[in-house]
């Protein structure tokens, strides 16, 4: 158990200081607020990342289609304003990866309204 806890801690440190970009914060929001498993949340998030990673998003979607991976769509279509607020807060809290990907002024890019639009595209 002790080794597993140390490994988990080190993994968290690695993610927190890496260039995981915009995907992980949005995925974490889906996991925290909507209880979607992390791996699936990453896949769902990639469906709305074209504006940040056009080539990678296109390649990901092409590969998912080729492999017949069924990625749920519309998971954020009928949420309440409170849920969108929770998603925003659960996403924007990941300051390090967002700053790494978008710069120190990432909050000017990922406003609550912009974040809602991105989630609605999922």
Give a label for each model feature:
Residues 1-68:
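Active-site segments that bind and position negatively charged phosphate/pyrophosphate groups
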């Amino acid at each position: 158990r002790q080794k597993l806890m140390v490994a988990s801690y080190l993994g968290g440190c690695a993610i927190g200081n890496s260039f995981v970009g915009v995907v992980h914060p949005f995925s974490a929001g889906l996991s925290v607020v909507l209880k979607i498993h992390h791996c699936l949340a990453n896949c769902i998030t990639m469906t709305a990342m074209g504006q940040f990673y056009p080539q990678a998003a296109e390649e990901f979607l092409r590969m998912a289609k080729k492999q017949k991976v069924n990625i749920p769509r519309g998971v954020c279509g009928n949420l309440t304003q409170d849920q969108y607020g929770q998603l925003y807060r659960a996403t924007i809290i990941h300051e390090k990866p967002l700053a790494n990907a978008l710069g120190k002024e990432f909050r000017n890019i990922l406003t609550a309204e912009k974040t809602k639009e991105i989630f609605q595209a999922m």
